[in-house]
């Protein structure tokens, strides 16, 4: 059993491979499974709105765009305080937590403004005070390495002129010492103190810089990923559907772990019959988790989304087209994600797979 569950590593790429140097090990980590630091609420004034905007409440997305260039802002927990007449329209005075979700390039002098809720366009209005504006990034809480040996080695990799791709990472290990996850990390040491876990061990607090990437394209694992990692620490799962209780972030984390644990196949199976357990396929992530387990077993990898599935169907991932796939309880996916299921079915049939969709009797 591996006592140290994390490794701090320097890495760089060569023409042929990736070189990894383990510089320190830690028994545990605190602050890794986190969302960005919440942003402060602020006043939001939407100018020239349809009158029905007076009744807005909840979470929204604001798009400020010129042609194909846009900024998307999340307006979280928006509360309307009142309205002011503006010709035939109204100005809406509200409060919300405002955070950039995505950004395009430079803007022209007269951007248009659209408001959305759950991808549904609610309407266009004339402007939002202070938007578009620069964004300085998502703030992240510090990460603490617990029980570190050799804390003096926890420092950023020195930049070398001949290295074009390099960096620092945190590797999570399972109980057998296999690297099961890799997370980019900044090694900006804020403090080092003796650890209560034993003599010669230290707790190291690492400040983390802001990131401009939206949280949905996170490098950091989501809070719900912790339970997924805990399960995988015992080794690659040997049972199907252990991912089913997890939310979307947890299922995403599960798919990420399958990719790093993917097997190397010397040859592919051709022909045969496989069954998808479709009872828990309620979103596109779970579709791929269930399909992967059907084709290459629990914890197996055969793509995390439809483009990766298309690549796997070319061969080299354990199973090649020419087989029969029986999809049990297909109505679950048919009700939840009909369009995505249809794309997957069409792709597999185009590749010569005999696919039979079965509904629960």
Where are these regions (language model features)?
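A short linear-motif detector with a strong N-terminal bias
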Residues: 252-255, 302-307, 334-336
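Helix-rich interaction surfaces within compact, conserved domain-sized segments
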Residues: 333-361
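Short acidic, S/G/P-rich loop/turn micro-motifs used as interaction or catalytic elements
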Residues: 280-283, 330-336
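Hydrophobic beta-strand segments of well-ordered beta-sheets in folded domains
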Residues: 272-274, 321-328, 353-356
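Hydrophobic, Leu/Ile/Phe/Ala-enriched alpha-helical segments that form helix-helix packing faces
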Residues: 170, 261-265, 291-295, 313-316, ...
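Conserved helix-adjacent loop modules within structured domains
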Residues: 49, 54-57, 65-68, 74, ...
